[in-house]
């Protein structure tokens, strides 16, 4: 069942197209008089206890099947060559099946910046086992309640999740990132996570891979919930009050360097990409994908130069305009 389900996730992730992307409702104000040379632009950022050379990473996607193994090897090669973080999909499949080697990418990519992922439904003992076996630089702990509810074989008991989060925060020996899975993390959840000691979250909003869509494609039911959750930019707007206390990572529908920059303008420390990179490795050779990702770095620098920003922190000073749903939501937030 696990193998079939993981391969279905890949298939349905690749086929879905979102009719709305919140990044299109943000317009950045161009600066006509430049302040910096292009070679002065610094892309480095800091989160999860370390400095990173680039403000984007390959986010958790897959594992637990032969197809997942093939994809993970390609993604690991891209990430290692480009010097960016790669986070594997949920390690739960390997915990259930010790012979599953679909997550074993470090031996063939020794310089890889590797993260891994586990669900908050799993007790901390399994999180500790995951860290021991994978030796990651960070551990994503994902929350996916709507996905679980839509899965015929999904979890139905959730009372333990908060105590699990407290345990993870206290006992896991590497930095943890509390991660949504495409439904947009709300401010109250960030507040509760902060109380438990969490200092880094991935908001992962609607607009990219929809696990509601994926599970409804698998079961053929409840497709009216396919657009459940908050869009990525909406989740980021909602989290503004927390950006000085909690490191905000952002993912969900990020398509290109301009989308990345828009996240960074609103205080994100870094930006995760899943389906965009998955589509690339399924369409082009690994060498071609490496060239594309390296090009993203150059594009980030030129956009920052045109905005008069020498550092990632400078981007938070950029003026912007909001349109459509984002503007309406921000106006409502002002009145609340």
Curated annotation (Swiss-Prot):
CDD domains reported for this sequence: IDI-2_FMN (cd02811)
The enzyme's E.C. designation: 5.3.3.2
Keyword Lipid metabolism set for record: no
Pfam families xrefs: FMN_dh (PF01070)
Source organism superkingdom: Bacteria
Alphabetical keyword list: Cytoplasm, Flavoprotein, FMN, Isomerase, Isoprene biosynthesis, Magnesium, Metal-binding, NADP
EC supergroup of this enzyme: isomerase
Cellular location(s): Cytoplasm
InterPro entries: Aldolase_TIM (IPR013785), FMN-dep_DH (IPR000262), IPdP_isomerase (IPR011179)
GO biological process terms on file: isoprenoid biosynthetic process
Residues bound to FMN: 60-62, 90, 117, 179, 204, 209, 253-255, 274-275
List of residues binding substrate: 5-6, 147
Cofactor: FMN; NADPH; Mg(2+)
Bilayer-crossing regions: none
Annotated binding of Mg(2+), by residue: 148
Subunit architecture: Homooctamer. Dimer of tetramers.
NCBIfam families: IPP_isom_2
Protein name: Isopentenyl-diphosphate delta-isomerase
Gene: fni
């Amino acid at each position: 069942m696990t193998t079939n389900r993981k391969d279905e996730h890949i298939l349905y992730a690749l086929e879905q197209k979102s009719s709305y992307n919140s990044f299109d409702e943000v317009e950045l104000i161009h600066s006509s008089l430049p302040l910096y040379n292009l070679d002065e632009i610094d892309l480095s950022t800091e989160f999860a206890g370390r400095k990173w050379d680039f403000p984007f990473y390959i986010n958790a996607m897959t594992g637990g099947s032969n197809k997942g193994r093939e994809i993970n090897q390609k993604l690991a090669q891209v990430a290692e060559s480009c010097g960016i973080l790669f986070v594997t999909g949920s390690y739960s499949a390997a915990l259930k099946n010790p012979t599953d080697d679909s997550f074993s990418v470090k031996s063939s990519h020794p310089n890889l910046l590797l993260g891994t992922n586990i669900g908050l439904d799993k007790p901390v003992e399994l999180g500790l086992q995951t860290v021991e076996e994978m030796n990651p630089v960070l551990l994503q702990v994902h929350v996916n309640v709507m996905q679980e509810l839509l899965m015929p074989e999904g979890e139905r008991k959730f009372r333990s999740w908060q105590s699990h989060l407290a345990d993870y925060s206290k006992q896991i020996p590497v930095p943890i990132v509390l991660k949504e899975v495409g439904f947009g993390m709300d401010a109250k959840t960030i507040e509760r996570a902060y109380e438990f000691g969490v200092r880094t979250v991935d908001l992962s909003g609607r607009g990219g891979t929809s696990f509601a869509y994926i599970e409804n494609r698998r079961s053929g039911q409840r497709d009216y919930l396919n657009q459940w959750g908050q869009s990525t930019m909406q989740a980021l707007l909602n989290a503004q009050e927390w950006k000085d206390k909690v490191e905000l990572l952002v993912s969900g529908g990020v398509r290109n360097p301009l989308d990345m920059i828009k996240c960074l303008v609103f205080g994100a420390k870094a930006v995760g990409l899943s389906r965009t990179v998955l589509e690339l490795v399924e369409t082009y050779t690994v060498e071609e994908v490496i060239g594309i990702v390296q090009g993203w770095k150059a594009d980030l620098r030129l956009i920052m130069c045109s905005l008069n920003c020498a550092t990632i922190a400078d981007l938070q000073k950029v003026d912007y305009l909001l349109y459509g749903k984002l503007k309406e939501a921000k106006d409502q937030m002002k009145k609340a």
